Structures are given as structure tokens and as C-alpha cells.
Amino acid sequence: MKKILSVFAVLSISLGAFAETLDTDTVLKDPETVLKEYKIEIRNVNGPEDVNVRVFSKTYLYPAETIKEAIKARLEKEGLYTKKKDNGFFACMGVKYNPLWHKMLDFYINVVGSENAGTVNLLVSTGYDNYMDETNLTACLNAARWLSELEYDIKMYIFLNNLSAEDETLAGLQKDIEKLQKQKAKIEKKIETNAEKIKKFEAQRIKLTEDNVNNLDTKKLDREKEQDRKLQDEKNALNYDLNEVMLQIEVAEGKLAQQMEVIKKLKETEPKK
């Protein structure tokens, strides 16, 4: 008898848990509860075939165009590509897309709004003029979940776009530093060449001694002075250029470090599901 009671108790607990799972997940929810829980509206709009249809609708506080591009990016990632339809809708036709339905379907989306907010209208069809609305509990629940998941997709789309822009800025700074490093190497090479010229010139120039001081070729001395002046001017100019480019490198490396910090902090804001 105790064994029977124990089995009955376990069975009762299991059934209770099963009922709770069903209640929070699928069949024990009515469409009105689903729509309220997921903050979904049902709207009448002029549909893709120029007929009045009821759509699942949700508004997001992001630019409408951003929302549209985020949806297309998600669908492309899932292997689906859209076609333009009437009244601002785009569609995926004749596809198997389990998030919305377990069989072949067509689904249509349009996004309306402004720079401040956008509303997504979702229409699901299992055949010509066979549109599914909130009276179909499974379709209602699937649509509600899908529209709710879009919040993450939009955030991720914005995040990745921002990250791409910052990475592009970083790449530009790295390219600038590479150019400056090449300029620095060229200047240093010219400085080496200038130093060799000065060394060679000093070795060949007239040396003043007691024996030749009275019979020097003054014109040659003047030419040597002019050559010496040019070599020194070149040396000074090259050293100035080197200092300038090294300063530019220092500034660019500072910007690079700042940009890397910007990217690091941005990555910390990656949206979580």
C-alpha cells in the first residue's frame, strides 16, 4: 500500500510539473495571454497583395531603417533571402522556417516608423490567401517569440556595425603609423647618406698648415665652404624632418592606444541574449 501511495505521489508531482511546463510554454496559453505577455499587437493593415490583413506587430525604440536592415541580416544569416512586395513589405516565399511554422510557408514583413522608433508588422501564410492570425495559438506564440527575439538581433546589428566602424578607424590609424614608419626609415637612410658625404668631404677638403697657408687656392676654399654649408643645411633639414615624423608617430601611437581602449570598452557592451 505504501508503495502504491509513493508511486501515486511521484506521478502527481510529475503530472503537476508537466502541466506547469505546458502552461508556460504552449497549449495552456490562450492567444490573448500570449500577446499580452510578449507585448504584441494585432493590427489591420493593407497587405502585400493589396488586401486588408491582420498582422502581428511590435514597436522597437530604434530607427526604422536600422530595424529593417537588422531583420534582413538575421534572415540572410539563417539562409533566407527576401523579395520586395507591395506596400513596403518584403517576403520569404515557399520556405521551411521553423521559428514561425513547422511546414512550408510564406511570411511577409514591413517596417514603418522614423529615426526614433520603428514598428515591425509580420504576416504569416501557409498558402494563397491563407493568412494565419492570433486565432491560431501556435502561429501566435511563434510570431510573438520571433518578434521578441528581434530586440536582441537589432541590438547585435547596431553593436556589430559600431564595432566595424571602430575597427575601420583602428585600421586607418595602423596604416597611418605604417606610412610614418616608412617615412622615418627613408629619412634615416638619407641621414646616413648625408653623414657619408660629410665624412668623404672632410677627408678630401684642404687642410690648413703653416706650409700652405700663404699659397692656398682661395676659389677652391670658397667652393669647399659652400659645399660644407650645403651639407650642413641638408643635415639640419633631415634631422628636423626626422624629429617631425617621430613626433607624428608618437601622436598616432597615442591615438591608436586610445582607439584600442574604445574598442575594448565597446566589446564589453556586446548584447546578451
What residue spans do the PLM features occupy?
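N-terminal, leucine/charged-rich tether regions that mediate assembly and partner docking
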Residues: 20-128
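Extended alpha-helical coiled-coil "stalk/arm" regions
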Residues: 176-228
